[in-house]
Amino acid sequence: MTDDTPLPFDLPSVRRKKLTVDFAGGNQSSNGGVLLLREAERKHGVCRRLAEAMPDRRDPDRIRHAMFEMVMARVLAIACGHEDAIDLDRLRHDPLMKLAVGRCPESGQPLASQSTISRLENVPSKTEAARLAAALLDQFGTTVKPGRLEILDIDDTFCAAHGAQQLAFWNAHHDERGFASMHIYHVRSGTPVVAILRAARTPKGTEVRTVIKHVTKRLRTHWPNTRIVWRGDSHYGRVEAMEWAEDDGVDYIFGLAGNMTLDALVAETADNLRFHHAKSSQTKLRTYASFIYQAGSWTRPRKVVARLECSLQPDAGETTSTGMRQEVDIRYVVTSLKGTAQHLCEDVYCQRGQMDSVRMPGEEDDQVN
């Protein structure tokens, strides 16, 4: 075949050299997607922003790999599925990787090796790691156009560890050692905002407050007129975080672990639900309640919303005429938001973690008030 096949898009030149693609042999690469990622970097500048936040304590006269080139190579390798730094020993000679970083595929010097990349990843201190997170927050804040109200989801994901990695703790729920990375997502766009690698343990109140405080303050420099709402499960409904949010004008809706006091406050509602469920032909029946509650560790009362669901369960014990037992499942939510109990539970809290199905257009601002 001698006819040229036209490409559906133009590839940009590198160092004033025209870039063409063929399969005639020579030094080939299977990482063609890095050229598209290079264009994304040109548009958004994520790697450059990270490189500027990284400390560079090297002797300027002995530098062979610029900070941006090392960060770019590491990010591109991860994006192509090469998570381990040792993969760079092979990828440093890859022609397309070199092109994407800005070096000529044949005559250009190889990229940074595994040992150089490993030293790079161990350079940042905790303060400098926080500076990198702030750089990503700035990237997000300048990229996403905010509305009048924005919801941020905060949650953790368990990641099993195979070996003796630092901070890999035993987790009884998952029955293995690992990490519990903290993730923050922007609900309207589904964009990840922050990811924090941490030990597999329930976060303390001071830890939750610190994260929420720093993320909120950083985003407010870009979203000065936007109302921010934090949403998370009971791990994040800590008194330290709620008090800071209330004092700083930030809204929240968090899960709340049940206890005997809360159950007593909705006991009458639960009895009425059992009565109506017994007379109903439905397999499940729900109702909602809201009330003011103050736990012993709280310095002020707060609004609590309860969702009660009655259903028939085939467990042993007191049974109905059908051989099934009535059971009422109760879930609690603590919030600073106004609105009906049903709306806050179903339309706001229960949409947690489902970014694709959650939208908060302007006309819904009155509901989440």
Tell me what each language-model feature is.
Residues D155, R227-G237:
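Acidic/histidine-rich, metal-coordinating catalytic segments
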